Amino acid sequence: MRIDIVTLFPEMCENILNESIIGRARARGYLQVCCHQLRDYGEGVHKRVDDCTFGGGKGMLLMAQPIAKAFDEIIEQTAVRPHIVYMSPRGRVLDQEKVKELAKNENIIVLCGHYEGVDERVLEEYDVEEISIGDFVLTGGELPAVILTDAVARMLPGVLSEDVCFEEESHYDGLLEYPQYTRPSAWRGREVPQVLLNGHHEKIKKWRREQSLKVTQKARPDLFEKAELTAEEKRAFGRK
């Protein structure tokens, strides 16, 4: 997969995406990430990328022309037309289902907003999907772009050592992850649940499922109501 990030602060994205699992995935060729400086596509001698908004109002808006130039150059470099995403507080909130959907693309362009946003016409012209990471406002779209890239990259074959690594994590199957423990088995009077120490894999699997349901019911009742439960689980958790 190739992900192109169009931003005013490419170093901000590169510094994070060169580290840890994503950095190794890039080094091994499982993922290609290209960060593009939007000012390189700016207008005039001063490479201008923003202007005042029509109709008045405070703040500056990213212009359509530089963004379009960046998009066109990236599109020319890819065999399959990229799916284009704009990180925006008014977009659909990113969740694991959307991450799975995005991971099916061969190429993705991620546009990072700044100032008061971007000219609406460029979003319409390129059929851009708007995605948010939550109901709050950030200074720019760089951190959301990194979050999206990280989440999508983890779904790609070879990025993680084993498929089970992400299949058992929170949100992958719609539930939150069960509690986990490591050595020592006793710490400050708190014991690791005995079932995890007996080596009985079926019992461990059942315990983890029960704990995952309990955690989800308590912390995210909205997710719990959507989860697929067996008849036995419905009775145990009082769900119809």
Where on the chain are the PLM-derived regions?
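SAM-dependent methyltransferases
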Residues: 1, 184-240
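Glycine-rich, flexible N-terminal cofactor/catalytic loop recognition
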Residues: 2-40
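Hydrophobic/aromatic beta-strand patches that form the interior of the parallel beta-sheet core
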Residues: 4-6, 34-36, 85, 108-109, ...
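Short, surface-exposed acidic-centric catalytic microdomains
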Residues: 35-56
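Short, structured active-site "lid" loops
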Residues: 49-70
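S-adenosyl-L-methionine/SAH cofactor-binding core of RNA-modifying enzymes
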Residues: 63-114, 119, 157
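Structured adenosyl-cofactor binding patch, chiefly the S-adenosyl-L-methionine
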Residues: 118, 122-169
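Internal, active-site/partner-interface "lid" segment
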Residues: 143, 155-194
